[in-house]
């Protein structure tokens, strides 16, 4: 349990699923006013091309959702209290086109809420056979400076390398913040060519649709790999929001 003051907001949308925002109040209000809020994000939705089929979403994006939950649990157990405000976001409707995060961004822009940095956790638990564990550091639709900062974090807090990769479109909720002009970054389970997309998507003509194969019992699903993202996330918020 966190020692810092926390509050939870259920951010409602026109569609049934809400976005969940956990706000952790920093001890230094002046610092928050100067910097803005530090955000860790993940999308909580999953989808299947055929609506009647299951869409378990263990990796996309149960893994990112759990990464945030475990980060929060570990920080609370350690007695962490931030100096500046931190938020944990679980977005709705990412699979529909970043709809939940875009609605949150629009709300923050409208209310003039400053954002110091945002890091997205989307697909964090798969290691392809015959490959070594790596972070896939996305270099497009992100903040170059914040991306470089993540490389420094990995060197100091992890024992696996970061490998640059491109997705060629705004592939997850970080892109909503990038479009609004706020610094955002995205690290995934591996470089694009070695991530789990081939297992959980099926190619139909020229489009990719999620299937019911995205389960935690598939070969390559790795909770130890997910734990590395938890450590990286902890480093991200502690280094940026500090430890009061």
Question: Model-found features: residue ranges?
Answer:
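Soluble metallo-hydrolase cores and metallopeptidase-like ectodomains found primarily
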Residues: 1-54, 73
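Surface-exposed patches in mature extracellular/periplasmic domains of secreted proteins
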Residues: 1-10, 83-86, 160-167, 244
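Extracellular/periplasmic catalytic domains that process cell-envelope and extracellular macromolecules
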Residues: 12-16, 24-34, 80-83, 97, ...
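Acidic/histidine-rich catalytic neighborhood of metal-dependent amide-processing enzymes
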Residues: 16-19, 48-145, 149, 170
